[in-house]
Amino acid sequence: MAKRKANHVIPGMNAAKAQGMGAGYNEEFSNEPLTEAQRQNNKKRKKNQ
């Protein structure tokens, strides 16, 4: 399955942040990326593991 280009990246943000995330995940978070502890407790990510 070919990787699709993330279409939810806002110009001016770091485009590399979108890689490896499902589309739409970033809209719920503030601009700074999650810390490692938050990532472990993130329910959306936990569902994918």
From Swiss-Prot:
Induction: Expressed only in the forespore compartment of sporulating cells. Pfam families: SspO (PF08175). It comes from the Bacteria. Residues 24-49 are annotated as: Disordered. GO terms for biological process: asexual sporulation; sporulation resulting in formation of a cellular spore. Signal peptide: none annotated. It is found in: Spore core. InterPro entries: SASP_SspO. Keywords: Sporulation. Its main location: other. NCBIfam families: spore_sspO. Belongs to the SspO family. This is Small, acid-soluble spore protein O. It comes from Geobacillus kaustophilus (strain HTA426). The gene is sspO.
